[in-house]
Structures are given as C-alpha cells and as structure tokens.
C-alpha cells in the first residue's frame, strides 16, 4: 500500500431498486395516509406478509406460463435447507396463503389490505422498477358483483381524494373455466391460421396460454389480436349476469367505463371480472391499478372453495401522476428550531426542547456537526432551512433572566412580521408558541 491513502470505492444501489430520500418521503407519506384513511372507511384490515415465500406459491398461484414466473422472479435456493424461495413479485397469493394457513375465514369473509415492496427482474424504465411498491386489497369470501363494484369504487374515491384526473376504467369478463376452455379451442384455431406472423412469445404461448397472446404489446400483432375470437362472446348465462350486474352498479354510481375484450391480465388466477385503471400520462406504463375476481385461487392453494376479488396499484406510478399534475403537497416543516450559545444555554435549551416536545410540538434541537459550537448566524441559517415556523433562542442573557428569545421565521407570531424577536418567560414559552401558531393558521385562512 502506498503512502497515499487508497481511494475507497463508493458503493451504489442496485439498478432498478431506488432509495426514497427525505425530500421525496413526504409525498409517500401523503399518499399512504390518504389511502389508509380510505381503506378504514371501507372496513378493511391490514395484513403484513413476508417478503420471501416458497417459490411454489407463485408457480402454483400465478401460473407457470406467465411472464412473471418465466422471466421476472427473483428466486434462489436457501443454502441452509435447500428450499426454493422467491422474493414476492406480487402479494395476492401470499395473502391467500396466510388466510389459509391461519384459518382466517373460519368465521366468515374478510376484507384485507396490504402495502409494501414487490420484486421483479425486468428492465428498469419510467414507472417500472425491480423493487416497486404496491398497495392492494383482497376481499375474501364475497361472490357477487357488488364486491367487484365496491373495490372498483374504492379506486375512484382514491383518485378523487388525491385530486387525480384522466384515469379511465376498462373492464372485461374472463367467464368461468368451461367458457374459457371453449374459447381456447377457437382461439388456437384462429391463431394457427396466422402462425407465420406470430412472434416467438406468441408461438410459445399458442398451446400453453393462448389468451395471453391477445394482450400482446407487439405492434405487428395488434390487428391479429383485434380480430381474434372474443371471450366475452362465449360467456354463459351465469357469467353474463355477473358482468351485467357489475355494469349496472358502476353506472348507478356514475363510474364511466369501457369494455375491453382484450383485457386478460397477466396472472392465471383470474376469472369473471377483470379491470384496469389506465392513463395516457405515463407513456407505455399506463396501468396504475388492476385487479379482478379470482374465485379458484383459494382452493388451488389448499383452502376450501371460496370466492374472492381484489386489486393492486403501483405506488410509484401514482406518485408520478401526482407530480405530473402538480398535486404533490408542500413539505411541512417542524414547529420549532432551538438555537443556543454557550454551555449553560445549551443545557437550558436542551431541557426546553424536551418540554416543548412533551406538549406535542415538533422540535429540532441544534446539535453541533463537529463538536465545536456553531455561530449564532449559522444556527439561524439552519433554523430557516429546516422549515420551522419559529426559532427559540437561548443565550447567556436569556439563561440569566429565565427567558427565551422567539423569532417567527415564516411571518407568524403576535407581531406578524418575520424575524421580529420577542422575549418570552420560559414558563410561558409553550403557551406563547401555541397561541402564535393558532393566530398564524387563522391569518393563513383569511
């Protein structure tokens, strides 16, 4: 090793797995608070499942001939016991697994919601990441179209609560298993007539999962997909009644929708209702929420036959929309930044900061960055940059007199002028600050 210190290489995060920095966290917190309030209003309960599950859960639940299972899962073998494990690419299968394992449905249906990171090994691009976050709902034990309509209505309420516009609803019905089987026969016959122009993905799916060919993103295959036999034409009376019942409920609640016969979703567990909320404001990644009915899944994963429906939405995509439409709320600063000069003042200021926190105020106490006392000027700069409404100042004079200086940093305070310092007795400091903040809020409402 040379005399000169060897340069230590900086480590970067994994591509497609992003840090959420403090300047962005406020928007996440705003969205999370808004959606949690909505979920409570609909009687949903939070469930939290592990990030890692047995790989078999997803191959059996999602379907082996799907993009997620074939190409996108982060799977590995546990070195301790040889188990095949996967970082969850979605969470419906995990919630259903938990409901079965813990016998959650023994006393009736459940409304559950989750939020957290998912993982898919795909090419990172705008709105599509290797680690991404979803919030979702699962209504377990509800069979009627009213449950489908309710979860769709929840999405519309969320867009309204967030102030988002231009998100459009598309719906379809995948019918029942026997109806899909009859459609599959005709669809394969049709696709075989065009096999020469099918791309490799379509050829691979032709006999394993032909329905997914209709969802192709290949521009060269759009006309073929458009003219293919439509599953909706194969629906029996029961499926048709369910789909028409959903449409009536949506219309009764003034929810506009488009029937998209090519909407099939990328997961094998869906039946009957499927839907997507789409926008043209995010480029190619236009789907912000999607879901539907998955009545066969609970039985497929070892439970008793139980109807179910749900949705998931990509949080990153919704936050992109909030920024795009300039709906991101301003970051709120703390209430108070405590400044001090001198050892005795530091101790008094530290005690005062804790007493202010006791009353529920948000307080930053100035701590030295390098162990040396900072100048009054630099501390006040920090106070202003923090977004605090007030600076509370302790110096030798304040300590000697049992007082504190208070400066309004945001035009608040009894004098109504920014940076007008007032002297306040320490015992009356909390009351003074609360009254000043109330007065400032009232002025802001005028």
UniProtKB/Swiss-Prot annotation:
Reactions it catalyzes: tRNA(His) + L-histidine + ATP = L-histidyl-tRNA(His) + AMP + diphosphate + H(+)
UniProt keyword terms in alphabetical order: Aminoacyl-tRNA synthetase, ATP-binding, Cytoplasm, Ligase, Nucleotide-binding, Protein biosynthesis
CDD domains for the chain: HisRS-like_core (cd00773), HisRS_anticodon (cd00859)
SUPFAM superfamilies for this protein: Class II aaRS ABD-related (SSF52954), Class II aaRS and biotin synthetases (SSF55681)
Domain of life from the UniProt record: Bacteria
GO molecular function: ATP binding; histidine-tRNA ligase activity
Family recorded in the similarity comment: Belongs to the class-II aminoacyl-tRNA synthetase family.
Quaternary organization: Homodimer.
Record's protein name: Histidine--tRNA ligase
Species per Swiss-Prot/TrEMBL record: Burkholderia vietnamiensis (strain G4 / LMG 22486) (Burkholderia cepacia (strain R1808))
